[in-house]
Structures are given as structure tokens and as C-alpha cells.
Amino acid sequence: MEIVLAKRAGFCFGVKRATQMAFEAAEKEGETFTLGPIIHSPQVVQRLEGMGVKVLSDLEGIGNGTVIIRSHGVTSAELEDAVRRQLEVVDATCPFVKKAQEHVKRLSHDGYTVVVVGDADHPEVQGIVSYAEGPVHVVGSGEEAARLPNMKKVGVVAQTTQSFETLKNVVKECLLKGGEIRVFNTICDATAVRQDEAKALAREVDCMIVIGGFNSANTKRLAEVCSELQPRTYHIETAQELDASWFQGVERVGVTAGASTPKWLIDEVIERIQEFDNKKKG
């Protein structure tokens, strides 16, 4: 059985940067915290917890130490709270997310009603929205955008892991809603490239394995686009979840992974698939 690993499987630039910053901070003296999980990988979070890094939902009761801002970013109020408490702040916010936050702040300041294309419940979107000084709407599709009120000036940004197709559909609707529109494509290139690569791979294999946290938006989207082309697509977090029956009659298996999936997890999955194959041959 041939195992084909996608070239861009695993950590993206922003996640790699954030995890490096987190592990470096963990090695220093004093208490270290992250506001929410540093990335959407339970296994990486566990490793950091093993080094003494505590995951907090808020800073209530924290008077000293180092707080790491997760790769998805936090709200402006949470960042201000950390500064007010005189904590040492290690800002591991992905630069692409940071750019979206800055666009929202500037658009809002200039009198635009802001439309954020994304998932309203996602921490990245909640952080982006918090930088708006005026009206702001979150929409996840063109259909939702069609229900927006008419607006004089509209400014559009996107969650970094959104699909370009969704952004286009929302922009089309916003063109009908406002007299003036400004659009910033804040989708991370890595997201689109990974999805295109995964789709191409899914067409060429008999089975597709997508590795990443079940709480990871970009991993879930990878699994979705793969399953549209290859029904035998399986989304897993760890090698332990693999099932030998998935590979019956399979000659080529494709493997890809979300932007928050570490290399060691990918290696473990590939090793496990190889074990299944060796048993089959033996």
C-alpha cells in the first residue's frame, strides 16, 4: 500500500511561530499561562501543560507571571486586561490574524459598517470583532449576508481560514447593500493552498486520512473538501483512532493534516498505517 503525504501537511507559519514562542516562554522561571489553548491541538496543549503552562479562560485572580496570547488572538479587552495587570505579555497572535484585527479597527474608525466573514463562535472571529468601534456583523455565507440591512459604507474582512468562495459570495451580497464597499482579503494563503492540494490528492487515492484537532476549523474544512471527492475520508486526532478495516482494498492512501497538527503526530499516523500494511502482507 502506497502512502502519499501532502507536501504542506501540518504546522503553518503562524502556528509554528506561536508554538515556538510558547515553548520558549515555558522554559523561563515564573508562572506561565495561555489565554485559551495556544493552538487547536489538544496534544500540543498537553505537552505545554506538562511543562507547567496553565490554560486560562480569563485572567481573574492572576497578579503576576507571563501570559501567552494564543495564535487565534484574543479580544482587545482581554489584551488590555493583561497589560493593566502588569503581566509579561508574549503575543503569539498569528500575523495574518493581527492584520485582520487592524483592518477592522481602521475601517470602523473611518465610519464603515464592518462585515466579518466567518464563524461567530470561533475565538479568532471574536477577537477580530472586538476591534470594531461601531456596527459590526458576522456572516458565514452569502445567504446570511443577503439578510443584512442596507449600509452606506461597508468594510469586509474574513476569518483567515475561510474559503475564498464564501468570501466572494458575501462580497456579492454586500455590493447590493452598500453605496461604498472596501474589501480586504484576509484569508491566509496557506489555507487555500492546503485545500487545493488536499483536493488534488483526494482524487488520486482510495482512502484519505485527515489529521488534526476536532476543535480545529481548518482541519474540519480539509476533511469536508476531501470527503466531497473521496467518500472514504477519515478525520482523526491521533494514530490510536485508526482502524485497519478502513484500508481494506486500498492501494493508495492519502494523508494530510491541519495547520495545528505537529509533525510527530503525522509521523505516528504514518507508522501506524505502515503497521497495518505489514500485517496484511504477513
Curated annotation (Swiss-Prot):
Kindly give the InterPro entries that the UniProt entry links to this protein: LytB/IspH
Give the EC number.
Answer: 1.17.7.4
Q: Name one GO molecular function term.
A: metal ion binding
Q: Does the keyword NAD apply?
A: no
Q: Where is isopentenyl diphosphate annotated to bind?
A: H40, H72, H122, S216, N218, S260
Positions annotated to bind [4Fe-4S] cluster: C12, C94, C188
Q: Keywords in UniProt for this one?
A: 4Fe-4S, Iron, Iron-sulfur, Isoprene biosynthesis, Metal-binding, Oxidoreductase
Active site: residue positions? E124
Which CDD domains does this chain map to?
A: lytB_ispH
Q: Which GO BP terms apply?
A: dimethylallyl diphosphate biosynthetic process; isopentenyl diphosphate biosynthetic process, methylerythritol 4-phosphate pathway; terpenoid biosynthetic process
Tell whether Iron is among the UniProt keywords.
yes
Q: Which GO terms describe its cellular component?
A: cytosol
> Where, by residue number, does dimethylallyl diphosphate bind?
H40, H72, H122, S216, N218, S260
Q: Which cofactor does it need?
A: [4Fe-4S] cluster
Q: Which family does it belong to?
A: Belongs to the IspH family.
Q: What is this protein called?
A: 4-hydroxy-3-methylbut-2-enyl diphosphate reductase
Species in which this protein is naturally found: Geobacter sulfurreducens (strain ATCC 51573 / DSM 12127 / PCA)
